[in-house]
Amino acid sequence: MGKKLDLSKLTDDEAKHIWEVVQRDFDLRRKEEERLGGLKDRIKKESSQRELLSDAAHLNETHCARCLQPYRLLVAPKRQCLDCHLFTCQDCSHAHPEEEGWLCDPCHLARVVKMGSLEWYYGHLRARFKRFGSAKVIRSLCGRLQGGGGPEPSPGEGSGDSEQTEEDGELDTVAQAQPLGSKKKRLSIHGLDFDADSDGSTQSSGHPPYLSPVPMATDSLQTLTGEPRAKDTSQEAVVLEEADVGAPGCHPHPEEQTDSLSAARQDTLTEPRFPRQSCTTALGLAVTPGPGVISSSERLSSRYPADEGTSDDEDTGADGVASQSLTWRDCAPAESQHLTGHQPTDADREEETLKRKLEEMTSHISDQGASSEEEGSKEEEAGLNRKTSIEDLPGAAPEVLVASGQTSRQETSPRGPQELMQPGRTTDQELLELEDRVAVTASEVQQVESEVSNIKSKIAALQAAGLSVRPSGKPQRRSNLPIFLPRLVGRLGQTPKDPNAEPSDEVKVMTAPYLLRRKFSNPPKSQDKAGDSFDRQSAYRGSLTQRNPNSRKGVANHSFAKPVMTQRP
């Protein structure tokens, strides 16, 4: 149970019933204490008798230790106690089936007192938990029932519970004082909040939901401290000063900036503005990038006073603020750029020179890319003349051409009309764009060079393997059967590019595939003899279950294929 017991919600009948139950509890406790006290007296008396019998040990062997009657074989047999180890008769002993023995009356009473009193347990509870449930209930109901003439708590309850009444009273008063204080604090806080809400309710109509929380915080602080609020004219002056200070290189403190922005938004909300009027008036102002645009808009808003009329005008002005401000910001920079673009300055000249230099650099990079592409195409043609067939090169060449086409298109493509129609763009923006273009072209050139190196590595790998490549001018179908090899020799030797082909070239073209096929198809023993053919009528052919080291396809090649040199006329 907690430190404080609140029974104030109970009715009078319920409180009376609980009081009676608690009183019965105390009566039962008193009776139990009296019973245990009588048992303790009996134990003391019998313990004195045992002290007398302890001197005469021989008497215990013939007489009972409690009633001092002689033992009888059938009527009063001798039994030994488990605790005191003295002999007693059957009438003065109690059976103990759990321990399979007997206990004399004094030892049995001692166990009952020990189990009933539980002095060790109550002592532990008193030391650890100094307040019990019944005592707390009595304490809480005592004052309530005493006023109505109820009974008072009996003095018997003060065994260990009534010792802490004063401490409980102090704790109760402290516990009652804490919720009262907390309630007072909460009420004071809520009162201030309600005051702030009531003061700001008239001003909340002018604040949109997306405004920064700085002015609201200042309003709440002002309402709490009771200081008067500053006038709108002073706020406008502060805003104009901060806008003048907020040049492209200068940035005010974040708190001041938020205050100025919030004040400017309040002014713009109360003023009905039109896009045409804002654009025309913006022609007479010097527009600067960054915070300068905001300062010019604030000046415009300060020139035209607010029309505090009906609520409909305020709503329409609040709804159209975002669109009007956007159109004004779009119109003013463009017109200022047209005004300043007709007068060339030193910055414009530097800008033109930088543009020319960057264009020359990009053209130089594009020329390098074209030359590297031409070198790659020449190497491809040389590789195609050296080898018979390759499937990767026809797919790689279009990729190179496509990449080169992309680079040339990107380099030769003129600027769009939007870029030409914007003479007032800053040098930094154009420099960044040109740097991006240079980086793109450099990456494309690097990609082309990597593709060329990949083609070179493939050609070197094919040369190391001993394969030859034929030109891919006219793709010809090739038969998989080696019996048509003489026809292919004649066709491959006489290409449209090389009509007067010599027979030595034809032999060179076909020697490498023949050697490879012979190398991979012949058994290891027949590799020493170049002119030996496979004997189909050999004595040893092997069993059906034994695997031939050469595949069946290889056997067919041996049986039908012959050296190219022997087939020539």
Swiss-Prot record:
| Ranges annotated as biased composition (Basic and acidic residues) | 352-362, 379-390, 526-535
Coiled-coil annotated residue ranges, if any: 431-465
GO biological process terms, semicolon-separated: intracellular protein transport
ZnF region ranges: FYVE-type: 58-112
Say if the entry is tagged with keyword Transport.
Answer: no
UniProt KW Zinc keyword:
yes
Where's the RabBD domain? 4-124
Query: What task does this protein carry out?
Result: Rab effector protein involved in melanosome transport. Serves as link between melanosome-bound RAB27A and the motor protein MYO5A.
The name on file for this protein is Melanophilin
Gene this protein is translated from: MLPH
